[in-house]
From Swiss-Prot:
Source lineage: Bacteria, Bacillati, Bacillota, Bacilli, Lactobacillales
Signal peptide (UniProt feature, chain positions): none
GO cellular component: cytosolic small ribosomal subunit
Name of the encoding gene: rpsB
Xref: PROSITE patterns: RIBOSOMAL_S2_1
PANTHER family, per the entry: 30S RIBOSOMAL PROTEIN S2 PROKARYOTIC AND ORGANELLAR (PTHR12534), SMALL RIBOSOMAL SUBUNIT PROTEIN US2M (PTHR12534:SF0)
GO BP, sorted A to Z: translation
InterPro entries xrefs: Ribosomal_uS2, Ribosomal_uS2_bac/mit/plastid, Ribosomal_uS2_CS, Ribosomal_uS2_flav_dom_sf
UniProt record similarity statement: Belongs to the universal ribosomal protein uS2 family.
Keywords: Ribonucleoprotein, Ribosomal protein
SUPFAM superfamilies (alphabetical): Ribosomal protein S2
Molecular function per GO: structural constituent of ribosome
One protein family per Pfam: Ribosomal_S2
This protein's name: Small ribosomal subunit protein uS2
Length: 256
């Protein structure tokens, strides 16, 4: 049984690609048709490939993989943080800092600084410092938490990276590829799929679409860690809709 049904994908707007003039020809095989100047993603392929992504992430999690969720644009930031936390994993949902993976030693030093500032406050050191210095420390902590808070407790560079919009997160993808870290990604019609190991053709600009896909991969982590099915209920929906119905509902745009 599919982990995500055609009906769920349709309702979340996963089928809406970008304007045809913005497409990447390498995504042609994942495109079903074009309507009103918008490419329509072939959701039959999305259903199958989402299954493959789920299995890949579940199996990795079962082997204690460290999984990093990445999505820094506003449509993705909240879902990426929430679902990574729910799965007990790690995330980056603000700007990707160049060298986050390839210069992990330096990043660890910044994380150590973040933990040091937190410890200073917890131990009461702030009460002994001038207000101006405390203000500077709080400002530094806020900035470090913004960019590194989601990986503060990540024990090592990730074994798997999940990306929302690899077109935007090109630096992150390149760092992962350089280090041999497999990348699972939501790939829209404007992106280059070549550097993605496990592709999920999907609208990566709609909040509902991002939430749907990201939550299912979080479920995969949970299932892998627990050795049992995550809490999903889609059995009656999975075969409810056909690809032909997509044409009838494509009247929207690539936004939530």
């Amino acid at each position: 049984m599919a982990v995500i049904s055609m009906k769920q994908l349709l309702e979340a707007g996963v089928h809406f690609g970008h304007q045809t003039r913005r497409w990447n020809p390498k995504m042609a095989k994942y495109i079903f048709t074009e309507r009103n100047g918008i490419h329509v993603i072939d959701l039959q392929q999305t259903v199958k490939l989402a299954d493959q992504a789920y299995e890949f992430v579940r199996d990795a999690a079962a082997n204690d993989a460290v999984i990093l969720f990445v999505g820094t644009k506003k449509q993705a930031a909240e879902a990426v943080a929430e679902e990574a936390k729910r799965a007990g994993q790690y995330f980056i949902n603000h700007r990707w800092l160049g060298g986050t993976l390839t210069n992990w030693g330096t990043i660890q030093k910044r994380i150590a600084r973040l933990k040091e500032i937190k410890r200073m406050e917890e131990e009461g050191t702030f009460e002994l410092l001038p207000k101006k210095e405390v203000a500077l420390l709080n400002k530094q902590r806020a900035r470090l938490e913004k960019f590194l808070g989601g990986i503060e407790d990540m024990p090592r560079i990730p074994d798997v990276m999940y990306v929302v919009d690899p077109h935007k997160e090109q630096i992150a993808v390149k760092e992962a590829k350089k280090l041999g870290i497999p990348v699972v990604a939501m790939v829209d019609t404007n992106a280059d799929p070549d550097d993605i190991d496990v592709i999920i053709p999907a609208n990566d600009d709609a909040i509902r679409a991002v939430k749907l896909i990201t939550s299912k991969l979080a479920d995969a982590v949970i299932e892998g860690r627990q050795g049992e099915d995550a809490d999903v209920d889609f059995a009656q929906e999975a075969q409810a809709d056909s690809i032909e119905e997509i044409v009838e509902v494509v009247e929207g745009s690539n936004n939530d």
